[in-house]
Each structure stands twice: as C-alpha cells, then as structure tokens.
C-alpha cells in the first residue's frame, strides 16, 4: 500500500483517517470500527463491503 494514498483516502462513512493493516490487507477506520478490504491491490471503500470489527480488534 502506497503511504501517499493513505494521506488522501478517508473513511466514506465518517471521513476520518484510515490505517493500513498489512496482515489482513484492509484499511481500518478506528472511529467507525470498520475494515475495508483491499482486493488485488485496490482498496474497496464501499460501506456494504466493509467488515464490522469486534471490540477486541484494532486496539
């Protein structure tokens, strides 16, 4: 994931900052507890595609 891309993309729900989870290939919104998948190197920033994170994740 290009770190320059992380500087300009935002959560489509709250417009907050996203962080990159290399192990799971996801972009994480800690505010909304949503994990957006990265498929074939392309972030899928669609709310219906996002996974709701458990309370234990992302700490």
From Swiss-Prot:
- Top-level division of the source organism's lineage: Bacteria
Q: Which GO terms describe its cellular component?
A: cytosol
Which cysteines in this chain are paired by disulphide bridges?
A: none
**Pfam families, sorted:** Trm112p (PF03966)
Q: Which InterPro entries match?
A: Trm112-like
Q: Describe the family membership recorded for this protein in Swiss-Prot or TrEMBL.
A: Belongs to the UPF0434 family.
Q: Which PANTHER family has this protein been placed in? A: PROTEIN PREY, MITOCHONDRIAL (PTHR33505:SF4), ZGC:162634 (PTHR33505)
Q: What is this protein called?
A: UPF0434 protein VIBHAR_01537
List the source organism: Vibrio campbellii (strain ATCC BAA-1116)
């Amino acid at each position: 994931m290009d770190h320059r891309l992380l500087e300009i993309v935002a959560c489509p729900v709250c417009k907050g900052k996203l962080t990159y989870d290399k192990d799971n290939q996801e972009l994480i919104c800690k505010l909304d507890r949503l994990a957006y998948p990265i498929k074939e190197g392309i972030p899928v920033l669609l709310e219906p595609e996002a996974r709701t994170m458990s309370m234990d994740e992302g700490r």
